[in-house]
Swiss-Prot record:
UniProt-listed InterPro entries: Huwentoxin-1 (IPR011696), Huwentoxin_CS1 (IPR013140)
Reported function: Voltage-gated sodium channel Nav1.7/SCN9A inhibitor.
Entries under PROSITE patterns matching the protein: HWTX_1
Protein name, per record: Mu-theraphotoxin-CCy1b
Tissue specificity note: Expressed by the venom gland.
Disulphides: 3-18, 10-23, 17-30
Species whose genome carries this gene: Chromatopelma cyaneopubescens (Greenbottle blue tarantula)
Length: 34
């Protein structure tokens, strides 16, 4: 499965962002997390 990279739209309830990224609940896109 392809993951979602930086600034890609996402669904916080079904987070498909890449490793080290998290779906931001407010902005609805993948943000980098340390």
């Amino acid at each position: 499965d392809d993951c979602l990279g930086f600034f890609k739209s996402c669904n916080p309830d079904n987070d498909k962002c890449c490793e080290n990224y998290k779906c931001n609940r407010r902005d609805k896109w993948c943000k980098y997390v340390l």
